[in-house]
């Protein structure tokens, strides 16, 4: 009702970003150690958070879901992302989860374990295939001066 009366469109421009670091802590896969009543509550919580992330994007909220182990994150949260940035993943299950979510072939998925420091696989849902990208070293002094921090 507020949006209808205020003239805000259903697909607002990005206004805010929330970073979910170590996302597996709140977006655990539904099958991991969840049995009985507690499991139902935990699974429902993950479902509600994933749904909220999907809905809040419409209102200009962006989410960055970060985890060193994509296999420890609920697959619905991974599917719900548009851009995936994958750096070296030594664990096979993590490579498969991230690689399949990025439209990679099995031979490409194996190569994720061999990526050098600073090289990432980048994929967006409307791309035909993922690309390799060199990521520059983080320079916090440059960032601080750019944003007057």
Question: Whereabouts are the PLM-identified features?
Answer:
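C-terminal lobe/lid and adjacent interdomain/linker elements of RecA-like ASCE P-loop ATPase modules
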Residues: 112-116
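Conserved P-loop NTPase motor module
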Residues: 118-149
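Conserved P-loop NTPase motor cores
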Residues: 1-111, 137
């Amino acid at each position: 009702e507020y949006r209808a009366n205020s003239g805000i469109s259903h697909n607002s421009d990005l206004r805010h970003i929330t970073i979910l670091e170590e996302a597996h802590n709140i977006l655990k896969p539904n099958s991991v150690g969840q049995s009985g009543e507690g499991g139902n509550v935990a699974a429902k919580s993950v479902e509600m958070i994933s749904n909220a992330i999907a809905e809040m994007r419409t209102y200009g909220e962006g989410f960055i879901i970060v985890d060193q182990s994509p296999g420890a994150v609920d697959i619905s949260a991974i599917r719900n992302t548009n851009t995936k940035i994958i750096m070296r993943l030594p664990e096979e299950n993590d490579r498969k989860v991230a690689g399949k979510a990025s439209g990679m072939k099995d031979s490409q998925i194996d190569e994720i374990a061999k990526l050098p420091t600073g090289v990432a696989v980048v994929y967006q849902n409307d791309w035909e295939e993922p690309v390799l990208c060199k990521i520059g070293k983080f320079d916090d002094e440059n960032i601080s001066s750019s944003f007057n921090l």
